[in-house]
Curated annotation (Swiss-Prot):
Binding residue positions for Mg(2+): S294, D356, D357
Superkingdom as given in the UniProt entry: Bacteria
Proregion residues excised on maturation: 1-10
NCBIfam families registered for this protein in UniProt: purF
Taxon lineage: Bacteria, Bacillati, Bacillota, Bacilli, Bacillales
Protein name: Amidophosphoribosyltransferase
Main EC class the enzyme belongs to: transferase
Active-site positions on this chain: C11
Homology family: In the C-terminal section; belongs to the purine/pyrimidine phosphoribosyltransferase family.
Organism: Staphylococcus aureus (strain Mu50 / ATCC 700699)
Substrates-to-products reaction catalysed: 5-phospho-beta-D-ribosylamine + L-glutamate + diphosphate = 5-phospho-alpha-D-ribose 1-diphosphate + L-glutamine + H2O
Necessary cofactors: Mg(2+)
Swiss-Prot/TrEMBL GO biological process terms: 'de novo' IMP biosynthetic process; purine nucleobase biosynthetic process
Annotated EC: 2.4.2.14
UniProt GO MF annotations: amidophosphoribosyltransferase activity; magnesium ion binding
Length: 494
């Protein structure tokens, strides 16, 4: 019932303005964002006369080869994208950046996140005669921009950004400027960096700035867009109807541990969440083990707080071929064992605390528990460094249906039995908020915790009817007992 699959973030975006090796630096930036998308990659370049691009399927090294990079040399400006599909199919027609050539201008555009009203916008645009060349929701905003009556591209962009809903960041390139934009809740991150020679960089995470030796300049905040051109950099607002709600899953799972989001280092946050989890749910054992890689920081925090040794009881194969993750049951059954190995000499005869970042479908953690016990572990106590993942996400994570979520239908006690653990406990929502430590004057201190609370800061829009029709009894119980701050259109409940 619950297939082997981890969570997947769908995209990473990168942009650079005014560097003689723009394409090469974009490639390096995308490489540092590879964890955000492995299904395809692309780069669009500009020299203020023309725009051209290259793209392909697979990891960055597969998608863009040396010959393609050679064709991108000599241009000063660029945007790039790594993709994991949450909207649209996996064909090359959906690999970004998209490049459009119009009679009066050319535009490259790429996007991270999910537009939750893309379906209805697309239907309206098609009724007006718009022709779409992909199934990606990114294409919607380009049609909105071109149909705008605004006098300038920037004004048309602002107008279009006010029409799309969801969690998103955009990187857009014309011959005159590099643009970046963030949704009205800042659900998805976007940062600006500056190199020593004055070159400006846009990126989904600060790790892409650091890898180029650039300095962090600022976060782009909720409802803001940035314009970078030969005159410098300008940050403006396209809407003042904003409520900061940064995705908690960026801290918990998606972002690289060396990245910083809204002033909070990801590794430090994860370690703090592990410490808080140990305070909330201690248990007697011989050692603490983390599930590689995103859970290692939390596991070290748990071990430090509880005063137990932190051991490497699981080893991850960093070089698993992508062909191992196949849509057949037989290969799925082998998936965890190929990716992870238990260290028998470490775990044999021991009582173990196993720390993981989340339980979504339950299949992966079930097989890890079995693997540890098959290797001689006496007891395995599972501790999860986030709350119960009970509600689907519509803002750019590939879990958009209740049926995929084991916590939507099973209690922690039932999940404990299903995964074969000796005990199971989760970090509380309040514990998560405290661990991350944001201090915005907003619900949940400025975090988006929709998957744990069913409270959707950007609303539901096209997803509302199906979401409500498939709510489980357990989800309905949670909603009835807990305050919600946002209505179905993302407005604050007064």
């Amino acid at each position: 019932m619950f297939n082997y699959s981890g969570l997947n973030e769908e995209c990473g975006v990168f942009g650079i303005w005014n560097h003689p090796e723009a394409a090469q630096l974009t490639y390096m930036g995308l490489h540092s964002l590879q964890h955000r998308g492995q299904e395809g990659a692309g780069i669009v370049v500009s020299d203020q006369n023309e725009l051209k691009g290259e793209r392909g399927l697979g990891l960055l090294t597969e998608a863009i080869n040396d010959d393609q990079m050679e064709r991108l040399k000599g241009y000063q400006h660029a945007i790039g994208h790594v993709r994991y599909a949450t909207s649209g199919n996996k064909g090359i027609e959906n690999i970004q950046p998209f490049l459009y050539h119009f009679y009066d201008m050319s535009v490259g555009i790429c996007h991270n996140g999910n537009l939750i009203n893309a379906k209805s916008l697309r239907q309206n645009l098609e009724k007006q005669g718009a022709i779409f060349h992909s199934s990606s929701d990114t294409e919607v905003i380009m049609h909105l921009i071109r149909r705008s009556k605004a006098p300038t591209f920037e004004e048309a962009l602002k107008e279009s950004l006010r029409k799309v809903k969801g969690g998103f960041t955009f990187a857009i390139l014309t011959k005159d400027a590099l643009y970046g934009a963030v949704d009205p809740n800042a659900i998805r991150p976007l940062v600006v960096g500056k190199m020593k020679d004055g070159t400006y960089i846009l990126a989904s995470e600060t790790c892409a700035i650091d890898v180029l030796g650039a300095e962090f300049v600022q976060d782009i905040h909720a409802g803001e867009y940035v314009v970078i051109n030969d005159k410098g950099i300008t940050v403006k607002s396209y809407t003042h109807h904003t409520t900061t709600a940064i995705s908690a899953m960026e801290y918990i799972y998606f972002a690289r541990p060396d990245s910083t989001i809204a002033g909070k280092n990801v590794h430090a946050v994860r370690k703090a969440s592990g410490k808080k989890l140990a305070q909330e749910s201690p248990v007697n054992a011989d050692m603490v083990i983390g599930v590689p890689n995103s859970s290692l920081s939390a596991a070290s925090g748990y071990a430090e707080e509880i005063g137990l040794p932190y051991e490497m009881g699981l080893v991850k194969n960093q070089y698993v071929a992508r062909t191992f993750i196949q849509p057949t049951q037989e290969l799925r059954e082998q998936g965890v064992r190929v990716k992870l190995s238990a260290v028998k000499d470490i775990v044999d005869g021991k009582n173990i605390i196993l720390v993981d970042d989340s339980i979504v479908r339950g299949t992966t953690i079930r097989r890890i528990v079995k693997m540890l016990k098959d290797s001689g572990a006496n007891k395995v106590h599972v501790r999860i460094a986030s709350p119960e993942f009970m509600f689907p996400s519509f803002y750019g994570i590939d879990v958009s249906t209740t049926a995929e979520l084991i916590s939507a239908s099973k209690s922690p006690e039932e999940i404990k039995d299903y995964i074969g653990a000796d005990s199971l406990a989760y970090l509380s929502v309040d514990g998560l908020i405290e661990s991350i430590g944001l201090d915005y004057d907003a619900p949940y201190s400025g975090l988006c915790v929709e998957s744990f609370t069913g409270d959707y800061p950007a609303g539901l829009y096209d997803y509302e009817a199906n979401y409500k029709a498939h709510l489980s009894h357990r989800q309905k119980q949670y909603i009835s007992k807990n305050k919600h701050f946002f209505d179905s259109e993302g407005n604050l409940n007064v």
